[in-house]
UniProtKB/Swiss-Prot annotation:
Its EC number is 6.3.5.-. GO terms for biological process: glutaminyl-tRNAGln biosynthesis via transamidation; translation. It catalyses: L-glutamyl-tRNA(Gln) + L-glutamine + ATP + H2O = L-glutaminyl-tRNA(Gln) + L-glutamate + ADP + phosphate + H(+); L-aspartyl-tRNA(Asn) + L-glutamine + ATP + H2O = L-asparaginyl-tRNA(Asn) + L-glutamate + ADP + phosphate + 2 H(+). This is Aspartyl/glutamyl-tRNA(Asn/Gln) amidotransferase subunit B. Keywords: ATP-binding, Ligase, Nucleotide-binding, Protein biosynthesis. Signal peptide: none annotated. Gene3D superfamilies: 1.10.10.410, GatB domain, N-terminal subdomain. InterPro entries: Asn/Gln-tRNA_amidoTrfase_suB/E, Asn/Gln-tRNA_Trfase_suB/E_cat, Asn/Gln_amidotransferase, Asn/Gln_tRNA_amidoTrase-B-like, GatB, GatB_C_1, GatB_Yqey_C_2, Gln-tRNA_amidoTrfase_suB_CS. SUPFAM superfamilies: GatB/YqeY motif, Glutamine synthetase/guanido kinase. Pfam families: GatB_N, GatB_Yqey. It comes from Streptococcus pyogenes serotype M6 (strain ATCC BAA-946 / MGAS10394). GO terms for molecular function: asparaginyl-tRNA synthase (glutamine-hydrolyzing) activity; ATP binding; glutaminyl-tRNA synthase (glutamine-hydrolyzing) activity.
Length: 479
């Protein structure tokens, strides 16, 4: 029997506000344990939460970016559970009325076609702290993360393969990152993914029993975990077994999933309305204000790059991988840079430099203005393409004018025949053996003179002009 794979994903994204959702503590990542905490985070008796307006702003932007309807009345609920990293013994979340609902995004499939993935809901909640289990037999609780604002984005079960799930996550991450509401870095925990997967016989409408997967710390592991579950569940069903509703974690070392617990339902959390927070009204003016702050998203930018700038689909995809890179490209083109030349530099030398340095493009000194000027002085013959690589490294580390650096460093390309011909004659005089080889007809003897000339000019001879002049002067020797 063959089975159809049914996948839905739950994505948590930490919002990059300065302070937490209900307390004034900093939400900054990477501080010493419990440095970013106060009495609200510790859940001291009598303290009350205070809503961070910036969190609502971010949630509205997310809902708009994901083509969602927005609830005009926002309220919160208590999700009750006990765990050491949750000192209140409940989490403030949204249950029956999320901020956004009925959304969708488009994903691109491997064959080049697109598919619409529906999004059921997007709701706000506070993050929990972090437990660390020491080798000394003690467990330690860090509440820095407690109260950091989260938006949870829950897809419909519209994905039919691990590859589609991977494509969905890639598209969703791009959109969220473009809004600026989250840096969506899985390595820092600001983006986390849970996957729900079930199988059903082809032709059956009813879903099978789902399994939830956790500990998916990369998009690659999401795909691997889902691939393992497809095989595990299919094998179990074919042998007459029954799939239980349970939570499993992906074990990267063993490339498989391991049972964590039998899955709880909503009733286990005893949701009820949060009594310490009021109802928040979201009017059309507020929504319009947030809509006006949204950028053009990757799909629209890719279409523009292909249709208006003549770039390939591959180039357009690479240039829109991050908003910072796309903005850099667009600024350079708006300043007069040739789109293909700018694209080639961003994907070639610049990408290699960034990878080697472990930096992003906003962390180096190069600006779009610098790059456009450098491309211009390559085009007008001031420097060669080879010399431009050296110029780029200087600009990446120090910034400044490309032309000014080239002139100060004596890197201007020599293209004047009146300057080059005497140097060629001197090369002939300094390399009599090579001249003799050439005159005697020795194979490839002429090629040595190119190297001699470039050495004599310290690499500054214009290669095209130099080749032309060398050919002329060598012909005179032969005559």
């Amino acid at each position: 029997m063959n089975f159809e794979t049914i996948i839905g994903l739950e994505v948590h994204a930490e919002l990059n506000t300065n302070s937490k959702i209900f307390s004034p503590s900093s939400a900054h990542f990477g501080e010493d344990p419990n440095a970013n905490t106060n009495v609200i985070d510790w859940s001291f008796p009598g303290v009350l939460p205070v809503m961070n307006k910036g969190v609502i702003d971010a949630s509205i932007k997310a809902a708009l970016a994901l083509n969602m309807d927005i609830h005009k009345e926002m309220h919160f609920d208590r999700k009750n559970y006990f765990y050491p990293d949750n000192p209140k013994a409940y989490q403030i979340s949204q249950f029956d009325e999320p901020v956004g609902y009925n959304g969708w995004i488009e994903i691109k499939l491997e064959d080049g076609s697109t598919k619409k993935i529906r999004i059921e809901r997007a709701h706000l909640e506070e993050d929990a702290g972090k437990n660390t289990h020491g080798t000394d037999g003690y467990s330690y609780v860090d509440l820095n993360r407690q109260g950091v604002p989260l938006i949870e984005i829950v897809s419909e079960a519209d994905m039919r393969s691990p590859e589609e799930a991977y494509a969905y996550l890639t598209a969703l991450k791009e959109i969220i990152q473009y809004t600026g509401i989250s840096d969506v870095k899985m390595e820092e925990g600001s983006m986390r993914v849970d996957a729900n997967i079930s199988l059903r016989p082809y032709g059956q409408e009813q879903f099978g029993t789902k399994t939830e997967l956790k500990n998916l710390n990369s998009f690659s592991n999401v795909r691997k975990g889902l691939e393992f579950e497809v095989e595990r569940q299919a094998k179990l069903l074919r042998s007459g077994g029954v799939i239980r509703q349970e939570t499993r974690r992906y074990d990267e070392a063993n490339k498989g999933t391991i049972l964590m617990r039998v899955k709880e339902g909503a009733a286990d959390y005893r949701y009820f309305p949060e009594p310490d927070l009021p109802l928040y009204e979201i009017d059309d003016a507020w929504i319009d204000e947030m809509r006006a702050q949204l950028p053009q998203f990757p799909a629209q930018r890719r279409a523009k790059y292909e249709e208006e700038l003549g770039l390939s689909a591959y180039d357009a995809s690479q240039l829109t991988a991050t908003k910072v890179l796309s903005d850099f490209f667009e600024t350079a083109v708006s300043l007069g840079g040739d789109a293909k030349q700018v694209s080639n530099w961003l994907q070639g030398e610049i990408a290699q430099f960034l990878n080697a340095e472990g930096k992003t493009i906003e962390e180096i000194a190069l600006t779009p203005e610098n790059l456009v000027e450098m491309i211009a002085i390559i085009a007008d013959g001031t420097i060669s393409s080879k010399m431009a690589k050296k110029v780029f490294v200087h600009l990446a580390k120090n910034g400044g004018s490309a032309r000014a650096y080239v002139e100060k460093a004596g890197l201007v390309q020599i293209s004047d025949p009146a300057v080059l011909v005497p140097i060629i004659h001197q090369v002939f005089a300094d390399n009599e053996a090579a001249v003799a080889d050439f005159k005697s007809g020795k194979r490839n003897a002429d090629k040595a003179f190119t190297g001699f000339l470039m050495k004599a000019t310290k690499g500054q001879a214009n290669p095209q002009v130099a080749q032309q002049l060398l050919a002329q002067e060598l012909q005179k020797l032969r005559d």
